[in-house]
Amino acid sequence: MQEFTNPFPIGSSSLIHCITNEISCEMLANGILALGCKPVMADDSREVLDFTKQSQALFINLGHLSAEKEKAIRMAASYANQSSLPMVVDAVGVTTSSIRKSLVKDLLDYRPTVLKGNMSEIRSLVGLKHHGVGVDASAKDQETEDLLQVLKDWCQTYPGMSFLVTGPKDLVVSKNQVAVLGNGCTELDWITGTGDLVGALTAVFLSQGKTGFEASCLAVSYLNIAAEKIVVQGMGLEEFRYQVLNQLSLLRRDENWLDTIKGEVYE
């Protein structure tokens, strides 16, 4: 797509601080490395600021939340806000957990660069009817017309923030732009952590100076296109997971990968 410029090669090996869950931690670390940056995962409040202060972007994922992790998240988010450090917040599980939803709403005061979630999570967060269960989106929540209008209103309240909403059609909404993106494959739903990985990749592109809107579009498209390149091979679950990470490191060598992004950007 002509709207975006190729972020590769990565200009510097940025440090990406991920406060995330134990299930997808290894996948995120390898995905960040595959793009040419360096990951660190520190969620102990005694040291969290030491790592956040050295980082070029912060990714906060609410999976496996605990009181200690919440303390670390609040400390890191506060520092990111004070120092203008790019920050991605992934609203995992807010459809089910009132604690997580309350935390995300508090984190809005720290002005994250990108707020990410699946269709059900974002609908829940902005007060729309939803059918999400656990941390998964519901097929009943894929209507976008009412969601887009509410997100546009929210972007007026939080003008520096972009929304990244994952689903069969991925949505990226900022104050002045909307993208509806169509890459991807259902096989990505077979393995845990791919949604978390999108958030981490968004942080990578933010560390390279991309806006929240650009970084979100690039991240979700990059992972989806990488997956599209291998799905035709008809492989098993673990092999598919392995090859997704493999393609993340290979796709950046393709100078024309942006041409395979499917979707539209509206002003």
Curated annotation (Swiss-Prot):
Substrate binds at M41, G193. It catalyses: 5-(2-hydroxyethyl)-4-methylthiazole + ATP = 4-methyl-5-(2-phosphooxyethyl)-thiazole + ADP + H(+). Coiled coil: none annotated. It is an enzyme of class 2 (transferase). Its cofactor is Mg(2+). Pathway: Cofactor biosynthesis; thiamine diphosphate biosynthesis; 4-methyl-5-(2-phosphoethyl)-thiazole from 5-(2-hydroxyethyl)-4-methylthiazole: step 1/1. Catalyzes the phosphorylation of the hydroxyl group of 4-methyl-5-beta-hydroxyethylthiazole (THZ). This is Hydroxyethylthiazole kinase 2. It comes from Streptococcus pneumoniae serotype 2 (strain D39 / NCTC 7466). The lineage of its organism: Bacteria, Bacillati, Bacillota, Bacilli, Lactobacillales. The gene is thiM2.
